[in-house]
Amino acid sequence: MRTIAVINRKGGCGKTTATVSLAAALSELGRRTLILDLDPQGSASSWLGIGPTDRRELFDAFLGTAGLADLAMPTRAPGVDMVLSSSWLVTAERSLQVDLALGAIRAMQGLPRSWDYVLVDCPPTLGYLASAALCGCREAIVPLQPHGLDASGVDPVLEEIARVRHQLNPALVLTGMVVGRVSRTNHARDVVARLRSTHGGDVFGPTIRDSIRVPEAAMAGLPVTAFAPDAAVARDIRAVAAELVRRDPDEATVDPTEARRAAGWRGVVDRLVGSRS
């Protein structure tokens, strides 16, 4: 089971679009996917027509008194389940703070292997909730758009991923950056080229074009690939999903030193989780 935090520090970068769209495209490839909506705004929950909740079960999952799997519910997208966002997440971030990291690890470790992928839609900040998601996940994906501000603003996100890897979760890897809402303008092409020049293979090969089908799909409460399956943007999303499948870090060459460090960290986490359960 691959666990992936979809993270950026700002709203409007295509984070929820990437989460919902990739989940649906992965399901078309036969991969059962769970979306964990960790954004208090609940955009992913609203997109799929379920809506965020004011119940506190997700908060309880971080406390260890409820299981994430028990909170999962089916969505309109076949093969895609979701744990709804909750207004209690704001309370969790304020009250639990550092304990959120341990809570996220414990919650993710408790998930059964019922899903092939778990995609965590992070809040549009680099606060405790986002850090907790990075602690609980094996991978991170950074969605962004081909605008100067998005391109220049990606560095703090990459630095946060590196910080969590160094201090808290040595198993964490950057799976890549997904560029969306790519228009036909020279500016968009230049920004994408600059991103590839700076970050090389960390940028996914396929990009997702700008299309009115995306907001239309959100209004309809459906993933783009279900709302407009033959649209060019749906083909883009499927291409990104296929590359995501290929970028499995557990099938890549593992540095022995990093592997030992990650194994030692997991042992410490297991002891901490056991002592607080």
Where are these regions (language model features)?
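P-loop NTP-binding core
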Residues: M1-S277
